[in-house]
């Protein structure tokens, strides 16, 4: 496991490492704390501890900075963010007791939230909530408040809400040391069983699940200076306000306060679980400085290898990835599919657009046979689709692909980058809908890319020439006609373009060869043309040495 930086720092050496290492941290949050919260009638064998009671004052000298008990409304976090941004950035220092600050991986795993102490347990509500302890990678103090009837009540830390196993040698502190994050549970998969639905933990990272999913890719509140040579900046959600859900609602609302050296922000997450869990995000940014390298609606994922290119990977599994492609619906009505890659060198691609209709990192391959992993079950990882609300104007969908040799590293980042910088001192509002699940995108396409593979073109001997095979699937009956295939490249020579029916896939197979010549990087584009109008995905690809 890699070392994880604190992720609110922005040292030159930290930019990529922090982004990569968070996948290991989130793997921890999903495996070390993956108990099921049982329904009320299943009485636990351990003594029942009453759910945490929010208190007006912390239990120790630590100051409650943001989640003070008092009146709360929809503008409360916006006002806090505006006030925070009007002052210079302050590094908050909330040191943990030495024993907690230096916890090992196994020790931190041994501190678990006691499910019988879940917020709203035994109240018959559709949601429950559990908090994460501070320690190990998660050093920052995160404040949490519960909101009910327009009143926010600070949720103080108490050690009795956690259980410590035999690995922990010291007692948990009695002081209000805060939390490192929280997770929301819901009867997502089975009536009467509260499964994990969503997690907020680490910088501005969060994750969610659709029905039947296992945790995979992550989202962030904001991306700043991603892949910048001077280092990436990682904003942090410093405080959360969670609204008590109603009995008959399938909605839970979370408010969050974001902070970093460059910007403060207010976020509102409206979460609706389902086959594809929907999260409506409303955000207002208050930049302290001009934001010229900003990413809105960022997603972070992992791609190690697939049939698309294994390099020298020595792995019994055919494919290993949380996502296998970037899907984009642009403002011109095109639907674009860009397979992901694990390049030998850092690659950044920008897809210019005006008023994007949607984009997201998609896990399209859903067959177990493609992964053969009995533990990871990559076929269950959710896709994440982003739908902008309103006109986002000019900018680009940016895709960053980072070399990695291990699946514990997140090495894929995507986001929307506005064309114009966001001025210092301004208020920048944007909104979007997130859909997490197996099929979060409506099947509006009649022809979609189902598989991309590449390999050497010359069977007799190795040559630089590459063979590409792109399979298309039809949603509906296959027409009698064969489409025309158009393949373009930014360099090299395209040869031997062939299009054929693929009955096994209810679609077509496009094959062609690329002679790179002296190029080290070539952009490829393939389109299928039908005589009758059809919505057909355009295939994009970046070939590199």
From Swiss-Prot:
Among Gene3D superfamilies, the record links this protein to: 2.70.98.10, Immunoglobulins (2.60.40.10)
Q: Which GO cellular component does the record give, naming just one?
A: outer membrane-bounded periplasmic space
Establish whether keyword Signal is in the entry.
Answer: yes
Segments crossing the lipid bilayer: none
* Molecular function in Gene Ontology: carbohydrate binding; catalytic activity
The keyword Nucleotidyltransferase is assigned to this record: no
Record keywords: Periplasm, Signal
Give the range the annotation lists for the signal sequence: 1-34
Example of a GO biological process term: beta-glucan biosynthetic process
Span list, region Disordered? 38-60
What pathway is this protein a component of?
Glycan metabolism; osmoregulated periplasmic glucan (OPG) biosynthesis
Q: What InterPro entries does its record include?
A: Gal_mutarotase_sf_dom, GH-type_carb-bd, Glucan_biosyn_MdoG/MdoD, Glucan_biosyn_MdoG_C, Ig-like_fold, Ig_E-set, MdoG_OpgG
Q: What does this protein do?
A: Involved in the biosynthesis of osmoregulated periplasmic glucans (OPGs).
Family membership: Belongs to the OpgD/OpgG family.
Q: What name is this protein filed under?
A: Glucans biosynthesis protein G
- State the organism of origin: Shewanella sp. (strain MR-4)
The record's gene field reads: opgG
């Amino acid at each position: 496991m890699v070392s994880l930086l604190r992720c609110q720092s922005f040292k030159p050496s930290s930019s990529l490492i922090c982004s990569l290492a968070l996948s290991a941290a989130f793997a921890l949050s999903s495996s070390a704390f993956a108990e099921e919260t049982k329904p009320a009638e299943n009485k636990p064998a351990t003594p029942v501890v009453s759910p945490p009671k929010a208190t007006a004052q912390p239990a120790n000298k630590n100051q409650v900075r943001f989640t003070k008990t008092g009146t709360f409304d929809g503008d409360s976090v916006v006002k806090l963010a505006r006030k925070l941004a009007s002052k210079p950035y302050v590094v908050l220092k909330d040191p943990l007791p030495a024993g907690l600050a230096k916890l090992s991986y196994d020790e931190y795993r041994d501190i678990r939230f006691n499910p019988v102490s879940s917020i709203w347990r035994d109240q018959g509500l559709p949601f429950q909530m559990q908090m994460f302890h501070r320690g190990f990678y998660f050093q920052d103090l995160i404040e949490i408040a519960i909101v009910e009837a327009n009143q926010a009540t600070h949720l103080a830390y108490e050690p009795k809400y956690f259980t410590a196993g035999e690995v922990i040698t010291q007692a948990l502190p009695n002081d209000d040391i805060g939390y490192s994050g929280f997770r929301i549970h819901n009867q997502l998969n089975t009536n009467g069983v509260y499964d994990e639905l969503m997690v907020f933990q680490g910088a501005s990272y969060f994750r969610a699940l659709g029905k039947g999913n296992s945790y995979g890719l992550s989202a962030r509140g904001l991306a700043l200076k991603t892949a910048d040579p001077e280092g990436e900046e990682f904003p942090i959600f410093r405080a959360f306000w969670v609204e008590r859900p109603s009995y008959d609602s399938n909605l839970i609302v979370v408010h969050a306060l974001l902070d970093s050296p460059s910007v403060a922000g207010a976020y509102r997450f409206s979460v609706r679980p389902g086959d594809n869990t929907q999260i409506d995000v409303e955000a207002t940014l208050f930049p302290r400085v001009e934001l010229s390298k900003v990413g809105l609606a960022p997603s972070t994922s992992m791609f190690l290898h697939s049939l698309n290119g294994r390099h020298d990977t020595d792995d019994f599994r055919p494919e290993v990835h949380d996502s296998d492609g970037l899907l984009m619906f642009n403002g011109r009505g095109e639907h674009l599919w860009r397979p992901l890659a694990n390049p030998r060198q850092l690659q950044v691609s920008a897809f210019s657009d005006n008023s994007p209709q949607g984009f997201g990192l998609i896990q399209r391959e859903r067959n177990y046979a493609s992964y053969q992993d009995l533990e990871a079950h990559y076929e269950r990882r959710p896709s994440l689709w982003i739908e902008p609300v309103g006109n986002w104007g000019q900018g680009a969908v940016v895709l960053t692909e980072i070399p990695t040799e291990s699946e514990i590293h997140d090495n894929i980042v995507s986001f929307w980058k506005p064309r114009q910088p966001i001025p210092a001192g301004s208020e920048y509002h944007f909104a979007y809908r997130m859909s997490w699940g197996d099929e979060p995108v409506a099947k509006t396409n009649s022809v979609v890319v189902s598989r991309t593979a590449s390999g050497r073109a010359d069977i007799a001997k190795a040559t630089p020439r590459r063979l590409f095979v792109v399979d298309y699937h039809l949603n509906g009956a296959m027409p009698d006609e064969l489409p025309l295939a158009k393949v373009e490249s930014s360099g090299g020579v395209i040869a031997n373009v062939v299009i054929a029916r693929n009955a096994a896939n209810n679609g077509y197979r496009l094959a062609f060869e690329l002679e790179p010549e002296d190029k080290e990087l070539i952009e490829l584009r393939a389109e299928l043309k039908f005589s009758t109008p059809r919505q057909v995905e355009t295939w994009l690809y970046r070939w590199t040495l």
